[in-house]
């Protein structure tokens, strides 16, 4: 199992990238 973290400032696209992962079936913990 791999854990991937998304970091970045406000407006850097974290939510967009997270949604792409969810759309591909990856679990998301916010």
Curated annotation (Swiss-Prot):
Its EC number is 2.7.1.24. It is an enzyme of class 2 (transferase). It comes from the Bacteria. It catalyses: 3'-dephospho-CoA + ATP = ADP + CoA + H(+). GO terms for cellular component: cytoplasm. Pathway: Cofactor biosynthesis; coenzyme A biosynthesis; CoA from (R)-pantothenate: step 5/5. ATP binds at residues 11-16. It is found in: Cytoplasm. One of its GO terms (molecular function) is ATP binding. Keywords: ATP-binding, Coenzyme A biosynthesis, Cytoplasm, Kinase, Nucleotide-binding, Transferase. Gene3D superfamilies: P-loop containing nucleotide triphosphate hydrolases (3.40.50.300). Belongs to the CoaE family. This is Dephospho-CoA kinase. The gene is coaE.
